[in-house]
Amino acid sequence: MEISPYCLLSLLPIFLLSGFSLSYDEFDGHAATSRALLQTRTTCKEDFANKNYTIITSRCKGPNYPANVCCSAFKDFACPFAEVLNDEKNDCASTMFSYINLYGRYPPGIFANMCKEGKEGLDCTDVTQSASATSDSIPRASTTASLAVLSTFLVLCLLFLSS
């Protein structure tokens, strides 16, 4: 039994459009730690989806993840956003960590367990305004767009091979 290329071609729009409705952190559980039961957090005004995470990912590399290098890179990235990250009324911290883990594929809790400087958290007084605060985005191919191009190419190949 042979599958018609036209059948595959008719399924292409379904696959292409299904990726547009899901976001990366839609399936992440965002636990409300140290919050009142009915207190809601506001959406973060900072656009962490388009920040330049190469500040962290180019310096903090496994498998050993050296604490001094990783914590320094993390501070260089996060300190310019310290005010919004420390505000417990928004979801900026959880959003930022979701993207750090997405782009860097770090073990869960690596920065929280490794980077400790005192009771008040990390000291950002010695960190200068870094590129993360000034350059909002780096060019990244969207996963959905990449899948769309790839699946279109495969369907076209099947059409040409079957004719």
UniProtKB/Swiss-Prot annotation:
In this UniProt entry, which residues carry a covalently attached lipid of the kind GPI-anchor amidated serine? 135
The disruption phenotype is: No aborted seed phenotype and normal production of seed sets.
Q: Tissue-wise, where is it found?
A: Expressed in pollen, pollen tubes, sporophytic pistil tissues, in the early stages of female gametophyte development, and in unfertilized, mature ovules.
GO biological process entries: negative regulation of reactive oxygen species biosynthetic process
Cellular location(s): Cell membrane
Please state the protein's primary subcellular location: membrane
Which gene underlies this protein?
A: LLG2
Give me the Gene Ontology terms describing cellular component.
plasma membrane; pollen tube; side of membrane
Q: Which first-to-last residue range defines the signal peptide?
A: 1-23
List the membrane topology term(s). Answer: Lipid-anchor; GPI-anchor
Residues carrying covalently attached carbohydrate according to the record: 52
Q: Which InterPro entries match?
A: LORELEI-like
Q: What is this protein called?
A: GPI-anchored protein LLG2
This chain's source organism reads Arabidopsis thaliana (Mouse-ear cress)
